[in-house]
């Protein structure tokens, strides 16, 4: 089974939502509470609140902290607050249950992971069994092109989670490649 997750709350997440719906891909959008501030700081356009609500009504939302700071660079009490309070803030913003968490850049520690699992049902990192970063040359994929890394993961694991950032899909002009990939892998199962 292929799943998809997208981080950060870029305006192009709306395109990912459309692809996920077209091919019936279970998708989680991991957003920091302050996704708009993050986008402006990083130089890309954020989702509007209305766009975020549209996605939240159709797909699962996961927490990506409040401010998108690297948790391992923070004091434990500050990191724990980012983990815990982001859940409640996102639940209030979108009136949905938040059960999944993704630490920014996958940076966590054993103690923070234990804390996270007391609050959330699951935590997605950037590396691990069946995880593939949709990126032209990612360290998370052992610096392999993502489609090659996907083939290796697919041989080893039944469940694959493709993850990425829609602002990177914009920057690296990956949209046609992504659409082609899902058409090839899921075209007979997805909506036409």
List where the protein language model places each region.
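C-terminal active-site subregion of NodB/CE4 polysaccharide deacetylases
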Residues: 1-18, 22, 84, 92-93, ...
């Amino acid at each position: 089974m292929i799943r998809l997750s997208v981080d950060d709350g870029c305006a192009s997440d709306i395109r990912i939502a459309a692809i996920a719906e077209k091919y019936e891909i279970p998708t989680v959008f991991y957003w920091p509470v302050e996704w708009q501030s993050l986008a402006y700081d990083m130089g890309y356009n954020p989702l509007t609140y209305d766009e975020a609500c549209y996605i939240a009504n159709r797909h699962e939302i996961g927490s990506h902290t409040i401010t998108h700071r690297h948790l391992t660079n923070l004091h434990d009490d500050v990191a724990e607050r980012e983990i815990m309070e982001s859940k409640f803030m996102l639940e209030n913003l979108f009136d949905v249950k938040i059960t999944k968490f993704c630490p920014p850049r996958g940076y966590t520690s054993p103690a923070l992971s234990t804390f996270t699992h007391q609050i959330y049902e699951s935590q997605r990192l950037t590396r691990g069994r069946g995880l593939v970063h949709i990126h032209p040359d990612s360290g998370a994929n052992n610096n392999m092109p993502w489609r090659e890394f996907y083939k290796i993961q697919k041989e080893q694991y039944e469940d694959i989670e493709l993850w990425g950032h829609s602002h990177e899909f914009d920057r690296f002009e990956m949209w046609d490649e992504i659409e082609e990939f899902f058409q090839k892998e899921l075209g007979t199962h997805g909506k036409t």
